[in-house]
């Protein structure tokens, strides 16, 4: 396994990270435990979760305690999303950050978090307040490093300048969506990250499953998070499937599947410290581990650029992931998602309804 520096820090992380948004539940505990143990055996030392990922933090804490492997991993978790229906149950205020961190530590059964990440942009809280709280947690030994997720370049830079001004802990990572269907972060975010020492740790490396290879034109759809959109066949999805067919040809010529090809491509991209792979089944993790050993040729990288030019996108994951949550935060109320313990703002959009976020 290859290890890379996480931005402008001394922390070294495996180039593949275990994502835990799906599958890390009590019902799926044995599979989740197998995923973590197998990942560690193959050299993966990076696990990503969030306080709003249902039972995920509790499951990870239980696994690491039972296996005694807490010291083998870099544990990252996120805060800021709605954790209740109160006016201070979300965001980047001092009150919420301190309370959220203490709650995550309890669920994770640990006395420190390696990387504590602002999950989404909070337009209501000054960056100074958020960074003051995070620096306090670093000084108190509760967290070691800080990062962002789904933040535009200018806000990350604002945070860096504030940290430098006051001598506070600074951001070392940003977690954006980045994949073969959306390369838009190459225009501004990656150049900024390279210049200012921010490690990129992409999520959605398989475009929410579109790049898994199971979604193709004329093929009967399996259950999955993209099924409803593909059945609707809006223009964005239709264009995505056309691009996917071309990418599958490249993958087959290499003798690998589309998921492995897509992950390998992303691991080869400039500025990427580690790729977050949501693996709810052990075979998904093993596919990601296989991708770690695939090195695409210069010719293959050029062919990818011809299909999806640098800085372009087919599906606007990045734009949606940044601004939609920020707009939601102007709502002061939250409601529970049916059948889960998770919350979402009450100003639900059409896409929320389609995705099943109903009361």
Stretch-by-stretch model annotation:
Residues 37, 41, 84-184, 188, ...:
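Glycine/proline-rich, positively charged
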Residues 185-223, 257:
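Aromatic-lined glycan-binding groove of carbohydrate-active enzymes
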